[in-house]
């Protein structure tokens, strides 16, 4: 029997994930959910295995019913909704994935990461499910590349990473993902 996957968020990232999942033979059903119900239904209508639903992710109780019978939830929502999605996934015992570590656990990103890697890591273990945060380009891909490089060197004390996601075009390009998140990233002080 194939997998049932909930994709929360039907923006650029969620749409891309849903379209890719639609091509996977081991995926039987995709639930596309968003605050913009029309966008969720439009995306679902363009796929073979999907259904579209409304979901206000600021209310964890609206996420939980969508998780019924799911094997995985892919959180492609703005970072502020991450805590609700993680808590709903833990409650429903559904595997969790996101593209960037969510907000809402602590007042700084660093404290949030310590809490996710500590307390929430234990919660995922206790629930018997997997929680994978930061699987986008940064964090995510660059961390995998850095880790893979470690096998080729004798020792390493520090790895510094710098991310620049330049977009070259002859005409104005709107933000390539969430303008709110992009502006928040630009406003952050270096760590």
What does each model-identified segment do?
Residues 8, 151-191:
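Active-site-lining helix/loop region of Rossmann-like oxidoreductase modules
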Residues 13:
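Hydrophobic/small residue at the entry helix of a nucleotide-binding pocket
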Residues 35-39:
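Helix N-cap at the beta1-alpha1 junction of Rossmann-like dinucleotide-binding domains, i.e.
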Residues 47-59:
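Rossmann-fold cofactor-recognition segment
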Residues 56-69, 81:
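Conserved Rossmann-fold cofactor-binding substructure of NAD(P)-dependent oxidoreductases
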Residues 67, 71-76, 96-98:
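N-terminal Rossmann-like NAD(P) cofactor-binding module of classical short-chain dehydrogenase/reductase
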Residues 100-129:
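Rossmann-fold NAD(P)-binding glycine/threonine-rich loop
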């Amino acid at each position: 029997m194939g997998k049932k996957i909930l994709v929360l968020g039907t923006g650029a990232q969620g749409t891309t994930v849903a379209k890719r999942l639609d091509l996977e033979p081991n995926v039987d059903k995709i639930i596309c959910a968003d605050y913009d119900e029309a966008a969720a239904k439009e995306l679902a209508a363009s796929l073979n295995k999907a259904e579209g639903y409304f979901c206000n992710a600021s209310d964890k109780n609206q996420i939980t019913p969508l998780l019924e019978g799911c094997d995985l939830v892919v959180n492609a929502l703005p970072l502020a909704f991450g805590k609700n999605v993680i808590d709903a996934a833990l409650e429903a015992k559904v595997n969790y994935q996101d593209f960037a570590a969510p907000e809402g656990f602590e007042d700084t990103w660093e404290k949030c990461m310590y809490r996710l890697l500590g307390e929430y890591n234990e919660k995922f273990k206790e629930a018997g499910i997997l929680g994978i945060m930061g699987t986008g380009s940064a964090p995510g891909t660059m961390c995998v590349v850095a880790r893979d490089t470690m096998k080729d060197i004798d020792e390493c004390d520090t790895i510094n990473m710098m991310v620049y996601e330049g977009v070259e075009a002859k005409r104005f390009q709107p933000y390539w993902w969430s303008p709110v998140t992009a502006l928040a990233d630009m406003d952050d002080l270096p760590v």
